[in-house]
């Protein structure tokens, strides 16, 4: 039986202490639409963060996973659930793929694996994604996955010297099931 954390292109796994070097490259990618300029960090701070993530005890519904390729075992990004409303049955997630690894289907597959777990195993009813309006790649990705724009917070985020709209997108479990099937293939 195949792992529910493994697809054709990617495998989702725990973050390991040795992953710190890859995260320094992802953080240096200021070219991502929507990435906020960050203060420079030391290599030691990335080592400490990766070590902390490796031993973190998630609450079951909020967690971050490494995304690595199945072909080469190369770390290409992260995906995770970071906010939940367990009473109402919703969760919010994020996905980050390093610049050298974009447009290869890694984000698509990582998100499908995450959503399948959250809908099937954790019994959530709705998934939320929040995207800066000028991040066309993420808007297109979520649209292809079946998310629907549910709202827009106008000029809600200040970034790079001006205010930007924030797009709220959602997908219900039954919508996901029709497109991707909740039970793994």
What residues fall within each predicted segment?
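Conserved hydrophobic/aromatic "anchor" residues
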Residues: 15, 65, 117-119, 147
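Conserved G/P- and acidic residue-centered "switch" motifs that form tight phosphate/ATP-binding loops
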Residues: 73, 105, 135, 161
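Short amphipathic helical patch at the helix-1/turn junction of helix-turn-helix
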Residues: 97, 132-133
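Conserved acetyl-CoA-binding loop-helix of GNAT-fold acetyltransferases
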Residues: 103-117, 136-144
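Structural motif
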Residues: 121-124, 144-145
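Conserved catalytic-core motifs of GNAT/GCN5-like acyltransferases
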Residues: 128-131, 148-165
